Design a protein with these regions (language model features):
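Membrane-embedded helix-loop-helix hairpins and adjacent transmembrane boundary segments
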Residues: 1-436
């Protein structure tokens, strides 16, 4: 996402690709204000997944299953994005055809099947150090070799002037709304994924979450510098057929071979570790909130581990299918597709942490979830997996992130169904206990 997909989008369209920066800025207050509340509930009740928290609040197995299913499905295109990151690096090393993608899939599958979560945990620190070294060298030395940031922006400006259309160093007026809604929708979705919530549930305390959130804006600065690699490619005279190849091509052109190899290793490991954590998080969600309650209630911990390994492999295969059969214009579109789905769990997970949950019952939230999932999926596939849908109203065109559109539809349907069900009525035992 950070090193391959974002610079690729910036290289292709310019300023529009920087929506990832306000998105990461908006994430921080969400983490600071909402996630500590979720941790407190989870810690008190023994919840380890979002679906656990939903069942504990509303006492509804169907709603629990809906949240779990969404987490598994939405993770697949996100893992697909990581596979693409590994693929472009392997391709830059000389492999051609489908071999880079096949190699990326095999490496990921073998990496996690044998060692599980221990594998990414062991090298996560090394991965972070390698990525920081590559990024710091890139954002300092690359502009220096190209004549400074002034020259970088000048070359990018000239290149976008030739391209024309909705590209450039600044946003076009028609891009304001989609840019804003992409940022808002992505921020709401970010910490609904199984792998991000795993980190929340594993925190030592609510204060730990808040303290970590304070330092998260540093990532936004880093992301902005990395995104500029897309502009630097124009200054270096880089031309690629596939936008995803722009960063490897830039490194190949400007760095000595030994550092290029180090950088490619960092990018590959930087994709491998989160992909592994994502697949394991989705597998654990499936095992705990579907397999155990519906298929094997008496399953042992060892049995759950075996099932999770198989499901983790299936999730990776699903990610591969997304790449092969749902080609997108930009790699980032895959992550945004996952966002369309996972953000539909936001009302069920978050409303339950505040008094607003007393105004919604499980059937209303489930109806809203179904409406958001169906509506969002239909819009996404009707638009060719493009993340933004354009509405024509009163002669004007309004382009909005499909995930946010579906979330609005979700909440509206939930409100309508709740009104049809009548006022709050009788609480479920689980809801009454949680409220107390």
């Amino acid at each position: 996402y950070t090193v391959i997909a974002v610079p690729a989008l910036v290289y292709a369209v310019g300023a529009y690709g920087f929506f990832a920066l306000p998105y990461t800025i908006l994430v921080y207050p969400i983490v600071f204000l909402i996630m500590p509340k979720l941790w407190k509930v989870a810690h008190a009740k023994g919840h380890v997944t979002a679906a656990d928290a939903v069942y504990g609040r509303y006492g509804s197995r169907p709603l629990e299953f809906a949240v779990a299913l969404t987490g598994v499905v939405a993770t697949m295109p996100y893992i697909a994005l990581q596979l693409i990151g590994m693929e472009v690096v392997i391709k830059a090393l000389g492999l051609t055809g489908e071999l880079p993608l096949a190699a990326a899939f095999v490496i990921l599958a073998l990496y996690t099947y044998s060692a599980g979560l221990r594998a990414p945990a062991l090298i996560a620190f090394v991965k972070d150090i390698m990525i920081y070294i590559v990024v710091l060298v890139a954002v300092v030395l690359v502009p220096a070799k190209l004549g400074g940031y002034g020259a970088v922006f000048a070359h990018a400006h000239d290149a976008f002037a030739v391209k024309g259309g909705a590209t450039g160093l600044t946003l076009k007026p028609a891009q304001f709304l989609p840019f804003a809604t992409l940022a808002i929708g992505s921020a709401l979705a970010a910490f609904m994924y199984p792998h991000t919530l795993t980190g929340i549930f594993a925190a030592r305390s609510a204060d730990t979450i808040r303290k970590n959130a304070v330092f998260l804006p540093a990532y936004t600065v880093l992301l902005g510098l990395i995104a500029l690699l897309g502009f630097m490619a124009y200054a270096a005279g880089i031309s690629v057929k596939n936008n995803n190849d722009v960063v490897p091509a830039l490194f190949n052109a400007l760095f000595p071979s030994w550092f290029t190899g180090f950088a490619f290793s960092a990018i590959a490991i930087g994709a491998l570790v989160p992909a592994a954590v994502m697949s394991i998080g989705a597998a654990n969600l499936f095992t705990r909130n579907f397999w155990k309650p519906y298929v094997a209630p008496d399953i042992t911990a060892a049995g759950q581990e075996k099932v999770a390994k198989v499901v983790s492999l299936i999730v990776k295969a699903g990610a591969l299918i997304f790449i092969l059969f749902l080609p997108t214009k930009f790699a980032l579109d895959l992550q945004l597709l996952g966002g369309v789905w996972i953000v539909q769990t936001f009302p069920s997970v978050v409303f339950g942490l505040f008094n607003i949950s007393n105004r919604f019952r499980a059937p209303a939230l489930l109806a809203g979830w179904a409406a958001g999932m169906i509506g969002g999926s239909w819009l996404a596939f009707a638009d060719g997996i493009k993340p933004v849908h354009t509405f024509v109203i009163g002669g004007g065109s309004y382009a909005i992130y499909t995930g946010l559109t579906a979330l609005i539809f979700n909440v509206v349907v939930a409100v309508v169904v709740q009104l049809l069900l009548g006022k709050r009525g009788e609480e479920t035992p689980a809801l009454r206990q949680s409220a107390g």
